[in-house]
Every structure is written in C-alpha cells, then in structure tokens.
Amino acid sequence: MTAAKIIDKAILLLGYDTLKNTGSISGFEQSALTALNTVYADVFYLCNKEGFQEITDASQPVNMPENVVFDIMPYGVAAFLASSQGDSDNQLFFSRIYNLKRKNILKEMTFEDKIPTV
C-alpha cells in the first residue's frame, strides 16, 4: 500500500476533507506526510532493528507487514493528523485505538527463553 492510501484512509476515518483548518492542500499534505513518517518509524522499529528510510513522497509504498499497514498505521496517522489540526477529541480517540493495536505487534513476536548449557 502506498503512503497516500494510508493517509487517505486516516482522513476518511477522521471525516476530514483535505482543507480542514489549513487553508492550503500543500500544508495539510506536509502535515499528513509527517504524521505518516512518525507512525511508520514507530511501528518499523517494533518489527525491525535497523534500515528505516523515511517516506519522502506519498506515492511511495510502505514496506511493512500487511496487518500493520491496513489495520494499525491509519489509526496512528489519524491521531497525529487530529493533533496537528487541534482536534483533541479525535486525537484522544484514535490515539487509544492506535496504542491498543500497536501492542498486538509485540504480542505476535515470539520470545524464546533459553537456559545456557554448561
């Protein structure tokens, strides 16, 4: 999925049009891209140790597992976009959803406890 599609899904979740409180599309798009990169970095390092590359263009694909891209990232982007728009009710609502969904990434990882042999 591309960055633009994640941003579009977040905007749809919020019920915004792209001009809400900004006066220009480019200002809103920059805020959206910043929000996306913040969330992308957050979930990237939950799944990987290194290799993060920031998204510089909304047409770029987001290389994360499908469940992260479709089910987690739009809620985080929505939370950060709401915050940038001064929409505290939506920011709180989507932050809670995002954090609950983000916890599932850690649950899916398996940790193996081994006692060393001597």
Regions from the language model: what does each represent?
Residues 1-62, 92, 96, 103-118:
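Conserved short "hinge" loops at termini or chain/domain junctions
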Residues 80-84, 101-108:
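Mid-sequence acidic-hydrophobic segments that form the walls
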Residues 84-90:
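Charged, low-complexity interaction regions
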Residues 62-72:
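Structural motif
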Residues 71-83:
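Short, hydrophobic/amphipathic alpha-helical patches that form generic packing surfaces
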